[in-house]
Amino acid sequence: MKLFKAEQWNIEVLLPLFEAYRQAYGQAENPERTLAFLTNRMRFNESLFFIAVDENEKAIGFVQLFPRLSSLQLQRYWQITDIFVLEHAQQTEIYAALISKAKDFVHFTQSNRLVAELAQNQYSMLESEGFKLNPKERLFELSLSC
């Protein structure tokens, strides 16, 4: 398995995986709109993706990060809103690798906070990666030291 930060030229690798993610949450297939959504997120630096690919270069998982700013803390932090792994024998390990890559990126950008707003069925995965539920904000948070 390889993990890498997606760029615009990787959208065709990400597109079928992102469509599978949307369909897993009950959304109708719409590759044209999905392509436009992904293209615009990357083009305007509104979010970034890390993609996991298997030995055949097929995308098997991704995590999407959005930059956030805290006026009170005077710093940037990152938010995971989407993480998805295809049904796979090593699904737990792939999720962990994607979260680890996100943590590394947060360190790289000299941020010290990563929050996640995910489906309830992913709560245990977040907790196993050190995230704590902040009931006031209904988000999982992970503080990282730079």
Curated annotation (Swiss-Prot):
Pfam families linked to this entry: Acetyltransf_1 (PF00583)
SUPFAM superfamilies membership: Acyl-CoA N-acyltransferases (Nat) (SSF55729)
Coiled coil: none
Gene3D superfamilies with a match to the protein in the record: 3.40.630.30
Alphabetical keyword list: Acyltransferase, Transferase
GO molecular function: acyltransferase activity, transferring groups other than amino-acyl groups
Signal peptide: none
Domain N-acetyltransferase: start-end pairs: 1-146
Protein known as: Probable acetyltransferase HI_0677
Species of the source: Haemophilus influenzae (strain ATCC 51907 / DSM 11121 / KW20 / Rd)
Source organism phylogeny: Bacteria, Pseudomonadati, Pseudomonadota, Gammaproteobacteria, Pasteurellales
